[in-house]
């Protein structure tokens, strides 16, 4: 499979948000706005790219018995670095995403890709898998955030599109996340078939 096919696969065929239904905790909780969704997606993508590459490089020296703990330590190291960078340079994003940045450590997308792809493929292919799955996750979260922000606040990326009288508060609350995700998954399934 070519590197472009690996990226396309992560965005379309194995989209973590709409096809694999992985990472639902940050998907539902952080997508109250397009900016939050995009920020969480980019944060997860950066960790995914780095961990896929490193885990693929370490696969030949990692004993099977300690494989999962090694994966978690590598993931935790990159998440810690990411959290420090976000706290230092992007305090607004840090305030908006809060606890969900450290929770990237236990995000099943990252551990799943480490186990399913990075541990079995070359470092370069694993890097491209991280890019593809990360882009798929980022696009999914951003789309979900855009829908929720437009319907709930009448704006997108902070720019007002609709007057306040058309806002539906439900969509910026947790039930709105489930409803929006359900409709988007249904649309994706319809388009696939």
Q: What are these regions, as identified by a protein language model?
A:
Residues 34-50, 70, 94-105, 175:
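Structural signature of hydrophobic alpha-helical transmembrane segments
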Residues 51-64, 111-121, 187-191:
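C-terminal ends of transmembrane helices
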Residues 81-96:
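Transmembrane alpha-helix boundary signature
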